[in-house]
Amino acid sequence: MGSEISKKDITRLGFRSSLLQASFNYERMQAGGFTWAMLPILRKIYKDDKAGLSAAMKDHLEFINTHPNLVGFLMGLLISMEEKGENRDTIKGLKVALFGPIAGIGDAIFWFTLLPIMAGICSSFASQGNILGPIPVSYTHLRAH
């Protein structure tokens, strides 16, 4: 396995992870986007090992539903484990164990803290007739989404 994951690979993973929900469905939720984001690095790790790549893709195409802004943390952990050649069951177990708590933390930070605070501040501006009132909250909502 011994691949060299570069900063460029990690940056590409980050950009691709922003499309996590592009193939959202109610059977596997974000699994398609999750696997698609990780695929270039998985190909680099498994190189000529078609069976290993196939097993990794199959595992990552299983159900996942987490917070889109914090998914990079989970992807980084899983890529690290893939790189070290960890057992498939260990990798799957970590993914299943962490995607729910990461979703809860992300929801608490973004939807239940950041956005209500921004909405409160910006509604004060808007109520005074300031046209700039809705812009920061709209931007924050779009960035958090």
Indicate where each model-derived feature is located.
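Soluble N-terminal domains of membrane-associated systems
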Residues: 1-90
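Transmembrane alpha-helical segments and their cytosolic interface motifs
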Residues: 93-122
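Juxtamembrane/transmembrane-helix boundary motifs in multi-pass membrane proteins
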Residues: 4, 87, 91-99, 129
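Helix-coil boundary and interhelical linker segments in multi-pass alpha-helical membrane proteins
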Residues: 123-133
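Conserved small/polar residues in nucleotide/adenosyl-binding loops
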Residues: 140-145
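Interfacial segments of alpha-helical transmembrane regions
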Residues: 133-139
